[in-house]
């Protein structure tokens, strides 16, 4: 008798993806973040759906509808804070997932990596538009500042900004379309995740050694299903601790003030997960230059497969590259800190140095270290 799991047209897709999938026997906890990101996406779509049932995308009522969710809807406060802090957990997992790919050379799976970069852009766009929806001070001014950056594009810039705004300033039309995009994008992201997995399953997973693991594979279930379950337990514990004990830890107090176009907050800054890119944007005195640096700070990830000059795939056996990688991580922490500081001395200088170091490490120092390590292999 044939097993339904292996013959049913739909169930066999799940079987080949999560049950009988051959996986390397030595993948570490760094490979848990894919499933955690899937969980984060599911949490965000689910909590977002329930929030959308009570939210009104109108400048007059948006702020009070969020207040209504927190005060009057059954467990509305829980749903709202799970959604807000779920975004933070999403980005923590994202950064760790991308960092893992950089460290272990997973970017040599060209299609999987590039779909991943597109996913990163889509998630950043979704998070930005979601931040605008509560219509607090930081929502309004964040939307104004970031959309205004497009005016730096020569010739069509101003027209483009007014087209996105749906008027001459961020107003009702902007809020309505941002809500529409914020609702539809997660489903597009879910579809892209399927493509991401499709390309990954064409090649199979990478592993910490960076070596071909075809001779030593184990089934995904039960080994990695139980391992993922442990990761999920940790993630939910962290998320619920944040939600139930300090839900506003990562938010901005200014967003508890309703949006007022006549009063600019003293320090306009995005959510913490955008601060590194915001610091790079601010470190260049020219508007167009800043916008290009901002876009390129993420787009540079697509160059990783081209900049890989080492004879070894993973950094596991490359101490020089390891050192430089961790300097890059420290640099990103520095940029995140600077992004939240006011634009004054010494923060401007620190931000500029950190920005130069960020691009230098990726474009020059890491490839140079790879060449040195190649030479050392011959000695």
UniProtKB/Swiss-Prot annotation:
Subunit structure comment from the entry: The cytochrome bc1 complex contains 11 subunits: 3 respiratory subunits (MT-CYB, CYC1 and UQCRFS1), 2 core proteins (UQCRC1 and UQCRC2) and 6 low-molecular weight proteins (UQCRH/QCR6, UQCRB/QCR7, UQCRQ/QCR8, UQCR10/QCR9, UQCR11/QCR10 and a cleavage product of UQCRFS1). This cytochrome bc1 complex then forms a dimer.
The protein's matches in PANTHER family, at most eight in alphabetical order, are given as: CYTOCHROME B (PTHR19271:SF16)
Q: Which residues bind a ubiquinone?
A: 201
Q: Where in the cell is it found?
A: Mitochondrion inner membrane
GO MF, any single term: ubiquinol-cytochrome-c reductase activity
Instruction: Spell out the protein name for this chain.
Output: Cytochrome b
Q: Name one Pfam family in it.
A: Cytochrom_B_C
Coiled-coil residues are none
Q: List the disulfide bonds.
A: none
Q: Into which family does the record put it?
A: Belongs to the cytochrome b family.
The coenzyme or cofactor needed here is: heme b
* Record membrane topology: Multi-pass membrane protein
- The regions listed as transmembrane in this protein's record are 33-53, 77-98, 113-133, 178-198, 226-246, 288-308, 320-340, 347-367
Q: Where does heme b b562 bind?
A: 83, 182
Q: Which GO terms describe its biological process?
A: mitochondrial electron transport, ubiquinol to cytochrome c
- Where, in this chain's numbering, is heme b b566 bound? 97, 196
Superkingdom of the source species: Eukaryota
Cofactor binding summary note: Binds 2 heme b groups non-covalently.
For this protein, the record's PROSITE patterns field holds: CYTB_CTER (PS51003), CYTB_NTER (PS51002)
Q: What else is known?
A: Heme 1 (or BL or b562) is low-potential and absorbs at about 562 nm, and heme 2 (or BH or b566) is high-potential and absorbs at about 566 nm.
| GO cellular component terms, semicolon-separated | mitochondrial inner membrane; respiratory chain complex III
Q: Give the record's keywords alphabetically.
A: Electron transport, Heme, Iron, Membrane, Metal-binding, Mitochondrion, Mitochondrion inner membrane, Respiratory chain, Transmembrane, Transmembrane helix, Transport, Ubiquinone
- InterPro entries, per this entry? Cyt_b/b6_C (IPR005798), Cyt_b/b6_C_sf (IPR036150), Cyt_b/b6_N (IPR005797), Cytb/b6-like_sf (IPR027387), Cytochrome_b (IPR030689), Cytochrome_b_C_euk/bac (IPR048260), Cytochrome_b_N_euk/bac (IPR048259), Di-haem_cyt_TM (IPR016174)
Which function does this protein serve?
A: Component of the ubiquinol-cytochrome c reductase complex (complex III or cytochrome b-c1 complex) that is part of the mitochondrial respiratory chain. The b-c1 complex mediates electron transfer from ubiquinol to cytochrome c. Contributes to the generation of a proton gradient across the mitochondrial membrane that is then used for ATP synthesis.
């Amino acid at each position: 008798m044939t097993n339904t799991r292996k013959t049913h047209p739909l169930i066999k897709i799940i079987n080949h993806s999560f049950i009988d999938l051959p996986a390397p026997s030595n993948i570490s906890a760094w490979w848990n973040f894919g499933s955690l990101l899937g969980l984060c996406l599911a949490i965000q779509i689910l909590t977002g759906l329930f929030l959308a049932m009570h939210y009104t995308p109108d400048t007059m009522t948006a702020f009070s509808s969020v207040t209504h969710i927190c005060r009057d809807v059954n467990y509305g406060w829980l749903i709202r804070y799970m959604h807000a802090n779920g975004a933070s957990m999403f980005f923590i997992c994202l950064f760790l997932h991308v960092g893992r790919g950089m460290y272990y050379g997973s970017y040599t799976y060209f299609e999987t990596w590039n779909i991943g970069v597109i996913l990163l852009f889509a998630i950043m766009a979704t998070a930005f538009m979601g931040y605008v929806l509560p219509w607090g001070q930081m929502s309004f001014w964040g939307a104004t500042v970031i959309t205004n950056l497009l005016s730096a594009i020569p010739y069509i810039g101003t027209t483009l900004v007014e087209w996105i705004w749906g008027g001459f300033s961020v107003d009702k039309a902007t809020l309505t379309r941002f809500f529409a995009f914020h609702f539809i994008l997660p489903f597009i992201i879910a579809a892209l995740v399927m493509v991401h997995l499709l390309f990954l399953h064409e090649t199979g997973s990478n592993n910490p050694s960076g070596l071909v693991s075809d001779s030593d594979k184990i089934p995904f279930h039960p080994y990695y299903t139980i391992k993922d379950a442990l990761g999920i337990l940790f993630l939910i514990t962290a998320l619920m601790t944040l939600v139930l004990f300090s839900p506003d830890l990562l938010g901005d107090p200014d967003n508890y003030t309703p949006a007022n176009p006549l009063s600019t907050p003293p320090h306009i800054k995005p959510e913490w997960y955008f601060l590194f890119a915001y610091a790079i944007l601010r470190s260049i005195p020219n508007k167009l230059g800043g916008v290009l640096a901002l876009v390129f700070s993420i787009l540079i990830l697509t160059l990783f497969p081209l900049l890989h000059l080492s004879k070894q795939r993973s950094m596991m056996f490359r101490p020089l590259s390891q050192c430089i990688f961790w300097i890059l991580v420290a640099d990103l922490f520095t940029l995140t800190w600077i992004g939240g500081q006011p634009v004054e001395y010494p923060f401007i200088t620190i931000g500029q140095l950190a920005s130069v170091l960020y691009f230098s490490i990726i474009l020059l120092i890491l490839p140079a270290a790879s060449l040195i390590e190649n030479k050392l292999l011959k000695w």
